[in-house]
């Protein structure tokens, strides 16, 4: 793989909120760029900013950190997590947005195969976390074992390859423990919505 360089993307919103600055990698795996699913999610957050003030949130498999950074900019206390090789980019992006987020972000490793989500969270956020079959069971176990008040999952439909099969398996197997409640498209930002991207909440089965 060629050596990667970084470039900044400025994300603006349709209101009075400040812009986010997010660095991406020119050569990367799935974690080094901002996917459309992440853009759709953060514009949804910024459309309804008040509910996030003071909330305790953890983002799984954050990649660039954009989801957690957006929530911290809206007043949430956020733990942004990923594997060790992804933390440098996340930390760079956290620092680039420090004036908006203050000290409301912690960045740390969370290995789905051996770590657990901390107790007492208001929300767990997972944006496009399902790409590989090997991660499905650990992710489902991780989510089922956590006591967060809300679990939000975002997924852009993949139509080929391992990512397609992994998504199908995840949403089938997660039904053992949760049902998926979709956010209606009318509630999303009208400029940032797509039929092949879902934003939903996992509601625990009773």
UniProtKB/Swiss-Prot annotation:
GO terms for biological process: methylation. It comes from Caenorhabditis elegans. The keyword Methyltransferase applies. This is Protein-lysine methyltransferase vkmt-1. One of its GO terms (molecular function) is protein methyltransferase activity. Its EC number is 2.1.1.-. Keywords: Methyltransferase, S-adenosyl-L-methionine, Transferase. InterPro entries: Methyltransf_16, SAM-dependent_MTases_sf. It comes from the Eukaryota. Protein-lysine N-methyltransferase. S-adenosyl-L-methionine binds at residues 35, 61-63, 82, 112. Belongs to the methyltransferase superfamily. METTL21 family.
